[in-house]
UniProtKB/Swiss-Prot annotation:
Domain of life of the organism encoding this protein: Eukaryota
Record keywords: Phosphoprotein
Compositionally biased intervals (Polar residues): 43-55, 80-90, 136-152
Compositional bias annotation for Basic and acidic residues: 91-109, 175-186, 193-216
Official protein name in the record: Uncharacterized protein KIAA1671
Signal peptide bounds: none
Region (Disordered): 43-289
Biased composition (Basic residues): 153-168
Species of the source: Mus musculus (Mouse)
One Pfam family linked to the record: Tankyrase_bdg_C
Modified residues annotated as Phosphoserine in this record: 62, 166, 205, 259, 262, 288
InterPro entries for the chain: Tankyrase-bd_C, TNKS1BP1-like
Entry keyword annotation includes Phosphoprotein: yes
Length: 308
């Protein structure tokens, strides 16, 4: 049935098929259960003797719908067919009227259902379909400012290389030299909004005063080596020592083998002398001859002259 392309013909065939089904499958309204028939009196239906007395009529005196089924069972086979055809013809006439009225209603409803896609859609469906897409106009543009700030913060919080010791010392000295007011101004950066645009004039004016204040940082205050001593007294004692040492330098220099010597002399390039042990020097002086001692003393004198 799905392969027909004419909807009106399809409806007509369906209507005829339904009528045929109802004709063959409908139960007779006069038929009743056997229990109810047994309870009823036999006088209503009559007996075989009564029927012979009445002139051979095989039906009851008062035709009623309830007694028709019993009379059909008692009639002979010849009259059974005639009575059945008469009853079915009457029933079909009555039922055909009801079916026509109901079929008109059904056909009109089926025409509306089958011709739905060809004809215009009903008025109730159109506004529902339009309202389905109304949420598109209500949506607002997404605010991506929060995502931008997250990206900026993640860039700032990336791991940096460790600061060298020289930078740490300079920062430490700068923090010591700063005044408490400057520290407060530097600490308030955490409470400022980084998204606010700063004017370039303010940045220049803010950068200039710290430059002037940071100039003395390059020359830190020198701590005294001897805190208990007066520096003026120490300076007065230094020239006295130089005067005492100067006459000794003018005299012939005498070697002092027991004094320890420095392992490296910066004046002589590439010359390194190990400090001789005192025990070896004493043994060498006792065992070595006079000419060897003079030779060693000359070498020492030449080394010190080159250094001077």
């Amino acid at each position: 049935m799905d392969y027909y392309y004419c909807p009106s013909l399809l409806k007509l065939l369906r209507y005829l098929w339904n009528q045929l089904k109802q004709c063959f499958s409908r139960r007779a309204p006069e038929a009743k259960d056997t229990d109810t028939l047994v309870q009823e009196a036999d006088s209503q239906y009559g007996t075989w003797a009564d029927q012979h007395q009445n002139g051979g009529s095989f039906g009851p005196e008062s035709p009623s719908p309830d007694s028709s089924a019993a009379s059909v069972g008692k009639q002979p086979p010849g009259s059974h067919l005639s009575s059945y055809t008469e009853s079915t013809s009457v029933e079909q006439r009555d039922s055909s009227r009801d079916r026509r009225s109901s079929s008109v209603d059904r056909s009109s409803s089926e025409l509306e259902s089958t011709d739905g896609p060809e004809g215009p859609p009903p008025s109730d469906v159109c506004p529902a379909q339009e309202d389905d897409f109304s949420f598109i106009h209500q949506t607002s543009v997404l605010d991506s400012s929060a995502l931008k700030t997250r990206v900026q913060l993640s860039k700032r919080s990336r791991r940096r290389a460790p600061i060298s010791h020289s930078l740490r010392r300079s920062q430490f000295s700068e923090s010591e030299s700063r005044s408490p007011l400057e520290e407060e101004s530097h600490s308030t950066w955490m409470f400022k909004d980084s998204t606010e645009e700063k004017s370039p004039r303010r940045d220049e004016s803010d950068e200039e005063p710290p430059r002037v204040e940071r100039t003395p940082v390059s020359h830190p205050q020198r701590m005294p080596v001897f805190p208990g001593m007066d520096p003026a007294v120490l300076k007065a004692q230094l020239p006295k020592r130089s005067e005492v040492d100067s006459p000794g330098d003018s005299l012939s220099w005498t070697p002092q083998p027991k004094s320890p010597k420095s392992p490296f002399h910066p004046g002589v390039l590439g010359s390194r002398v190990l400090p001789p042990s005192t025990e070896k020097e004493e043994r060498s002086e006792e065992c070595s001859p006079q000419w060897l001692k003079e030779l060693k003393s000359k070498k020492r004198q030449s080394l010190y002259e080159n250094q001077a």
